[in-house]
């Protein structure tokens, strides 16, 4: 009888673990869909959708060191602009153990800038996953880093 109870407990834990694994897979799919929709909305200049995908206290960090846009400031900046096109090439998504937050990194491609990287954080809300922070950067090959950073230093010294 004791073996039976142990077997039942083991089966319950396995079932719970399988459900957790399935939930994580579904969350990763949903987060990927949010990020894809975010990029699609930017490309179309659909600012209503774009900003609805951000949390109320969402922040966008741009490529310029001065660009730290809180959601409402960024909405005003975007205004009637036509948008920007970035296509995700690769993406990695991780969830916190409690499943309430996620972080990601993705390599992007655009006709304007070529390779870039997006990183950020999403939070689970009653309305689904929302982007709490998005950070766009230009990865610099190590062989070019010294030259590029020297150019940035010279630029900053001149301003």
State the predicted function of each range:
Residues 72-115:
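Surface-exposed, charged secondary-structure patches
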Residues 133-159:
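Low-complexity, intrinsically disordered terminal/linker segments enriched in charged
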Residues 42, 119-128, 152-154:
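Short beta-strand segments and strand-loop junctions that repeat across beta-rich extracellular domains
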Residues 1-4, 19:
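Positively charged n-region of N-terminal signal peptides that target proteins for export
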Residues 17-52, 150-159:
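Short, low-complexity N-terminal intrinsically disordered segments enriched in polar/charged residues
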């Amino acid at each position: 009888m004791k073996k039976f109870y142990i077997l039942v407990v083991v089966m319950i834990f396995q079932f719970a673990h399988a459900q957790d694994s399935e939930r994580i897979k579904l969350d990763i799919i949903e987060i990927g869909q949010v990020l894809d929709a975010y990029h699609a909305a930017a490309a179309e200049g659909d600012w209503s959708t774009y900003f609805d995908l951000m949390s109320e206290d969402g922040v966008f960090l741009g490529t310029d060191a001065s660009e730290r846009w809180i959601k409402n400031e960024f909405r005003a900046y975007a205004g009637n602009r036509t948008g920007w096109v970035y296509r995700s090439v690769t993406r990695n998504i991780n969830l916190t153990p409690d499943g309430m937050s996620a972080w990601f990194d993705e390599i992007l491609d655009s006709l304007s800038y070529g390779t870039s990287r997006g990183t950020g954080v999403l939070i689970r809300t009653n309305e689904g996953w929302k982007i709490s922070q998005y950070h766009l950067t230009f990865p610099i090959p190590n062989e070019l880093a010294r030259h590029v950073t020297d150019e940035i230093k010279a630029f900053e010294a001149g301003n």
